[in-house]
């Protein structure tokens, strides 16, 4: 720093507290445009040595330096005569800053010592022109939270290394919030990155490592060669999770929901959640409970239990999950949001989500990014998630980071949401415990995600039958010689006189005896008397059972009027005002109900009865096709008003959320929500049904099969806009055939409602009936405003959902020569063309529920056509799509024996729809003519 500039700076009155903010603003201006500040100030700022980081990141440290000088300028007045000392002072502060930014790159993280990062020049004092001669000099430490104002440089460097280059590598300087950074600095710098634990706590950590290792060795001996996806090498996960639960309990948490993949899952089930070892052994032996459906492999199964902590009982729930990595994460978040909504405490610490990831999967699977992007979105936030990465440095056979990812760390994705990231060596259980408490406290304090990167290794192959040395020879040579985490820590405690060899041996023997006994090995386990009531009213119900379908006409009109009334202070957009005026007319009985009016009235009747409704999707508030307008936007000030939230004071909650632009994570979230909250009608709407296949993993692994595999009921509704209107291959088909292909054992319902009354009753049936199974709806687009797709108030008040609808025109059944069966929008094309042709010999029958197929209802509809032997199934979709291939066996069952069943529709096609309107129109006319023309 130039001597003249320093003297002028120290002599000036700008250091007074009143001008501190002025200096900070001046520096901000300099960072933005150096020419915008006075030449003297610019010269001084330019002489500040660089740190290799961005100017805005460096600014916070310089600003703190200014603040300290402003507090006690006299402390530095003597330095005027020695400007070199002042220059070194700034360099010392920059050295501190360098450790905060990049100390993690020199941390001792890899238990095997194989993973090495390049040396960081910034961490060398010489880089900052600090020499060994300066080591005995005292310098102000700025904001370094060690509890001292000044330290000798040598001592300061030692403290920085202990804090940032030990078994913990802290990454947090990417966070923009100064408050959050200061909080982390206070927590880790005040103890130099090393918390103090009592002898009892250390013994507990050893005991938990003993359990983690003991179970794996026991299973390996008892069931050699069986897949168990061992935790060995990452044993510290067990004490980490147990410490997390203990600390959460003391912090007021009452529920913990965990999601994890296969690695270490069996260990967590037994040693953390308290599953009986004997039950696990039975699963290895192939025994199963008959009532659990088709079942699943043991390392996919969930579990729940109650654990005693110092703060009270904590309910633990480990989510069921498939082998599709990372997809369980948004399911967990959805489950947690449901529990928070049930408590009506969205920012509460009472429910804690913990997601456990693999190092290869957390970087490789896009659903991780989608889930992180939801973490602060209003409809999906849960007050932060503790995200633990079991970083065993290998993904199946891929261990070269240049193959696995494009970032230095597997956790770098966490920086997109400014989550702090704490890397920790899994062979140091005390560092693991310290980081665990730190991470949870950060999450609880700031309501944000936090990552723990548990740096470990995988002692065996991907599974126990795999031979890893074929692809990782050097790594596995090292692993064979490397002692286990339990052995390393037992030796340390013996050396520190905390335990003896006999103590450690006794722990091993006692745990093995407990496994032999087969009973629970988690002493904190308590009888589970919480949460078990939730699903009992929804057991053992069938899809066709009756439900309270009627609503008194007077009440229905009152509700219709209430949800179509907006306060005068709300200035509505003109088209929206017209829609609401029409709904007022519908409520008065002056107009027939359209789709949007009937749908929103269904929600009103449910919340009126205290039943919550949650609706989410990319444009759910308005509706992709401008039909719903559940949320009204004030044109004068941008505020919003949701009429369905103002039915009456004691109503059920109505929440509608415009989702982030995601299918996979959002649908998984809503599945998790619905499986945790059966009382809420949970609905996910795709922007177009075509885009739902972005969530195909959720549909295949959870929605269609979750009950059969895991016994998990779910009442989720999927609204998938579907219909051929000439909009091309990406805006026509929700892929009805794929859902029908997944249907078996009455696992879900697939409906194609064709009238407003049908959607009204379908939604009410889903909420009011006891059965909780997914409902997949091919919802309309053009029918939303079709003049024939309307329903009367009487149909809403006194009707019910009809899985099949017969002929509506007055045709003489005896004169009918052909019956055309169909679903969805094509019905209206057929109806209008038949009326135009003045045909009396073709009846049109609608199948509104394609699965479970309504055999009885269809037989009732068709009984008047017993003389007919010419039947046609008409669909808009190509031959190889739609319902034809999946459902024709049902059609044949309900038509008279020996009758012909013919297809009318588009020819087989690789693409769902054509891209040219003229071709579309010709195809549409051809299929309608084909269905109606009787030779």
Where are the predicted features?
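Thiamine diphosphate
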Residues: 2-8, 16, 50, 59, ...
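Subset of Sec-pathway N-terminal targeting signals
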Residues: 7-48, 55
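Extended, charge-enriched "interface" segments that sit outside catalytic cores
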Residues: 11, 48-237, 253
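Conserved phosphate/anionic-ligand binding catalytic regions in large, soluble enzymes, centered on
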Residues: 94-111, 243-272, 357-372, 376, ...
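Glycine/aspartate-rich loop-and-adjacent alpha/beta segment that forms the canonical ThDP
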Residues: 99-102, 106-139, 143-154, 159, ...
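Active-site cores of enzymes that catalyze phosphoryl transfer or operate on phosphate-rich substrates
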Residues: 193-215, 281-344, 643, 753, ...
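Cofactor-binding active-site loop characterized by glycine-rich and histidine/acidic residues
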Residues: 254-418, 422, 625-677
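Hard-cation-handling environments
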Residues: 485-486, 496, 500-613
């Amino acid at each position: 720093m130039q001597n003249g500039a320093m003297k002028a700076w120290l002599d000036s009155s700008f250091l007074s507290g009143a001008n501190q903010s002025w200096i900070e603003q001046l520096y901000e201006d300099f960072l933005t445009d150096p020419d915008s500040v006075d030449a003297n100030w610019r010269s001084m700022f330019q002489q500040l040595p660089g740190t290799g980081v961005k100017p805005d990141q460096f600014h916070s440290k310089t600003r703190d330096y200014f603040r300290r000088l402003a507090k006690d300028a006299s402390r530095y007045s003597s330095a005027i005569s020695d400007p070199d000392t002042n220059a070194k002072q700034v360099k010392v502060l920059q050295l501190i800053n360098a450790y905060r930014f990049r100390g993690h790159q020199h941390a001792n993280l890899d238990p095997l010592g194989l993973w090495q990062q390049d040396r960081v020049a910034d961490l060398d004092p010489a880089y900052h022109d600090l020499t060994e001669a300066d080591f005995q000099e005292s310098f102000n430490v700025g904001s370094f939270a060690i509890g001292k104002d000044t330290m000798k440089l040598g001592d300061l460097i030692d403290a920085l290394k202990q804090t940032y280059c030990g078994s913990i590598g802290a990454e947090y300087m990417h966070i923009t919030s100064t408050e959050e950074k200061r909080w982390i600095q206070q927590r880790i710098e005040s103890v130099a990155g090393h918390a103090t634990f009592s002898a009892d706590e250390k013994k507990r950590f050893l005991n938990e490592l003993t359990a983690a290792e003991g179970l794996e060795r026991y299973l390996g001996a008892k069931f050699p060669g069986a897949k168990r996806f061992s935790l060995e090498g990452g044993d510290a996960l067990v004490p980490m999770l147990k410490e997390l639960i203990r600390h959460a309990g003391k912090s007021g948490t009452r529920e913990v929901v965990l999601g994890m993949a296969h690695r270490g899952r069996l260990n967590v089930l037994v040693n953390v959640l308290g599953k009986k070892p004997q039950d696990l052994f039975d699963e290895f032996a192939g025994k199963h409970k008959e009532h659990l459906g088709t079942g699943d492999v043991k390392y996919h199964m969930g579990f729940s239990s109650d654990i005693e902590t110092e703060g009270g009982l904590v309910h633990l729930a480990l989510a069921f999950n498939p082998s599709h990595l990372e997809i369980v994460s948004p399911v967990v978040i959805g489950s947690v949001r449901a529990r928070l909504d049930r408590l009506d405490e969205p920012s509460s610490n009472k429910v804690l989500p913990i997601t456990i990831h693999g190092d290869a999967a957390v970087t490789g699977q896009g659903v991780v990014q989608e889930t992180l992007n939801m973490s602060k979105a209003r409809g999906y936030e849960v007050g932060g998630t503790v995200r633990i990465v079991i970083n065993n440095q290998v993904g199946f056979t891929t261990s070269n980071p240049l193959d696995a990812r494009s970032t230095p760390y597997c956790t770098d994705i966490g920086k997109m949401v400014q989550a702090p990231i704490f890397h920790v060596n899994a062979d140091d259980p005390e560092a693991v415990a310290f980081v665990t408490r730190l991470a949870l406290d950060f999450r609880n304090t700031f309501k944000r995600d936090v990552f723990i990167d548990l740096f470990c290794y995988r002692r065996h192959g991907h599974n126990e039958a795999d031979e890893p040395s074929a692809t990782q020879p050097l790594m596995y040579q090292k692993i064979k010689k490397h002692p286990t985490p339990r052995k390393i820590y037992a030796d340390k405690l013996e050396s520190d006189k905390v335990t003896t060899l006999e103590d450690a041996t006794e722990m091993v023997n006692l745990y093995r005896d407990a496994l032999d006994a087969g009973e629970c090995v988690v002493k904190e386990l308590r009888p589970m008397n919480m949460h078990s009531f939730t699903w009992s009213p929804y057991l053992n119900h069938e899809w066709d059972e009756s439900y309270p379908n009627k609503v008194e006409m007077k009440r229905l009109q009152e509700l219709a009027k209430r949800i179509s009334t907006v306060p005068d202070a709300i200035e509505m957009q003109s088209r929206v005002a017209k829609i609401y005026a029409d709904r007022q007319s519908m409520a008065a009985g002056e107009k027939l109900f359209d789709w949007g009016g009937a749908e929103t009235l269904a929600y009103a009747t449910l919340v009126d009865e205290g039943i919550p409704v949650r609706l989410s999707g990319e444009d759910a508030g308005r509706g992709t096709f401008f039909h719903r307008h559940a949320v009204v936007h004030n044109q004068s000030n941008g505020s919003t008003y949701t009429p369905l939230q103002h039915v009456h004071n004691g109503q059920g909650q109505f929440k509608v959320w415009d989702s982030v632009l995601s299918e996979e994570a959002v649908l998984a979230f809503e599945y998790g929500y619905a499986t945790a909250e059966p009382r809420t009608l949970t609905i996910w709407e795709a922007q177009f049904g075509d885009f739902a296949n972005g969530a195909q993993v959720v549909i295949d692994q959870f929605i269609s099969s979750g009950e059969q595999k895991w016994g998990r009921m779910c009442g989720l509704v999927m609204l998938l806009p579907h219909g051929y209107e000439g909009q091309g291959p990406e805006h026509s088909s929700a892929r009805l055939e794929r859902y029908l292909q997944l249907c078996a054992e009455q696992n879900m319902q697939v409906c194609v409602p064709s009238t407003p009354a049908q959607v009204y009753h379908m939604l009410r049936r889903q909420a009011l009936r006891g059965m909780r199974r997914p409902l997949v709806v091919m919802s309309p687009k053009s029918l939303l405003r079709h003049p024939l797709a309307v329903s009367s108030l009487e149909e809403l008040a006194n009707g019910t959902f009809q899985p099949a609808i017969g002929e509506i025109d007055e045709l003489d059944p005896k004169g009918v020569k052909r019956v055309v069966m169909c679903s969805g929008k094509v019905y209206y094309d057929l109806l209008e063309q038949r009326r135009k042709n003045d045909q009396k010999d073709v009846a049109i029958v609608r199948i509104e529920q394609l699965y479970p197929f309504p055999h009885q209802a269809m037989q009732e509809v068709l009984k008047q056509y017993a003389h007919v032997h010419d039947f046609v199934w008409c669909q808009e979709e190509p031959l190889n799509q739609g319902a034809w291939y999946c459902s024709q066996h049902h059609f044949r069952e309900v038509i008279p024996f020996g009758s012909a069943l013919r297809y009318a529709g588009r020819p087989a096609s690789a693409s769902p729809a054509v891209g040219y309107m003229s071709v579309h129109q010709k195809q549409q006319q051809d299929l309608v003519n084909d269905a109606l023309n009787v030779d």
